[in-house]
């Protein structure tokens, strides 16, 4: 993992796309997240560029699904959902990235900052990651 030359990026598009994927294709959410992560942090691809994000999603989604993901990501409801999630993160005390709000099997929740090396793992259930 290395920081790409073009970092930082405006990550709104990939975040909104993941929000749509989580809602519409929940069984593929984690794999799509990892695909996007790998594209940027391992392969140096700028996933904020729509064409690059589309290519990143194509192995896991049909061409029609990718078109729907990208178009829905720019729609008002998904823009608002990301705004709401960002507000919730700030209200919970988030002050940087990565910020994870983790819930264990007993329902106990706890925030973690800068602990991305722990996620995603099978033992953690991420309720909110910003």
Predicted regions and their residues:
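Structural alpha/beta surface segment adjacent to cysteine/selenocysteine redox centers
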Residues: 1-40
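C-terminal cap of thioredoxin/glutaredoxin-like
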Residues: 35-130
């Amino acid at each position: 993992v290395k920081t790409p030359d073009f970092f930082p990026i405006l990550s709104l598009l990939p975040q909104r796309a993941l929000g749509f994927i989580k809602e519409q294709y929940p069984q593929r959410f984690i794999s799509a997240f990892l695909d996007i992560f790998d594209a940027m942090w391992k392969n140096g691809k700028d996933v904020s560029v729509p064409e690059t994000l589309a290519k990143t999603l194509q192995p896991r989604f049909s061409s029609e699904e990718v078109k729907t993901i990208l178009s829905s990501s720019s729609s008002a409801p998904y823009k608002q959902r990301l705004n709401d999630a960002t507000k919730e993160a700030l209200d919970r005390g988030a002050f940087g990235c990565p910020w994870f709000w983790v819930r264990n099997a007993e329902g106990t929740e706890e925030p973690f900052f800068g602990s991305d090396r722990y996620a995603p793992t099978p033992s953690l259930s991420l309720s909110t990651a910003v």
